[in-house]
Amino acid sequence: MLEVNLFGIKFKNPLILASGVVDMTPELLRRAHREGAGGVVTKSIGMEPRKGYENPTIVELPYGLINAMGLPNPGWEAFLEEFRKEKFDFPVIVSIFGGTPEEFAFLAEKLGEVADAFELNLSCPHAKGYGMEIGQKPENVYEVVKAVKDVTDKPVIAKLTPNVSDIRELGLAAEKAGADGVSAINTVKAIAIDIYAKRPILSNKFGGYSGPGVKPIALRAVYDLASSLDIPVIGIGGITTWQDAVEFLLAGASALQIGTAVYLRGFSVFREIAEGISRYLKEEGYSSVKEIIGLALKV
């Protein structure tokens, strides 16, 4: 009932662990799957090891988180050494980031043996020179996606920033370059200030906002992208309940990524949401989750 097929890859359900603030060891990826995730996305991997920013890197708010982790990762060589020893019985999407199209392509070439698909982090809002600074311009999105598609036969997903006037332009550029899908949204630019210290709370000052507060923004982005593109859209942003998940599916998302809810509530959210979607489908008379994808686009 919940199984979906994306880019020729089978997922037991449309719920995928998002790349983000949860540490991504192989054992934690397995735990996410045991707790109900249909697939996983790794931490974003770059050319060199990065320790990330000094604490504090996360601010908890009533309706989500602001984070500025600084893209901490072991670098591609250490990541490859660790993950090539592992065998996973579920889809593993490897997230990569770089400062140029050539760096993205290099990483895709090197990490192909441990990836079922690649997600291109074109949208991190707080790491200077990476992510959003590249991904805000459609021409840059096109160049990065094309460079990666030229060197790998693995499916390529472009992760898009919401910090633009029209996210559809980014999606269309990714599609034109040959992307197999897009994921949206990454976090929204944000800041939190300590009123007694009279300074920003995060060590980096600025961060990315995620969680329930961004859901309506994310839902609109998914709706717009699904209305405009012929490739699958993976919905991300504030999905916390099964009702949230159903909204994204109706808006045209072919699959969903969940991150902040895992940080706040634990891996059990995957099973809770999957069970809720199943109940909804039965109550509404559907035999497959595929039957409800995009229904709200037809109104």
UniProtKB/Swiss-Prot annotation:
UniProt-recorded name of the protein: Dihydroorotate dehydrogenase B (NAD(+)), catalytic subunit
Gene: pyrD
Quaternary structure and partners: Heterotetramer of 2 PyrK and 2 PyrD type B subunits.
Annotated metabolic or biological route of this protein: Pyrimidine metabolism; UMP biosynthesis via de novo pathway; orotate from (S)-dihydroorotate (NAD(+) route): step 1/1
Catalytic-site annotation from UniProt: C124 (nucleophile)
SUPFAM superfamilies to which the protein is assigned, alphabetical: FMN-linked oxidoreductases (SSF51395)
E.C. no: 1.3.1.14
UniProt KW keywords: Cytoplasm, Flavoprotein, FMN, NAD, Oxidoreductase, Pyrimidine biosynthesis
Domain of life, source organism: Archaea
GO CC list: cytoplasm
Molecular function in Gene Ontology: dihydroorotate dehydrogenase (NAD+) activity
Residues that coordinate or bind FMN: S19, K43, S44, N121, K159, I185, G211, G237, G238, G259, T260
Pfam families for the chain: DHO_dh (PF01180)
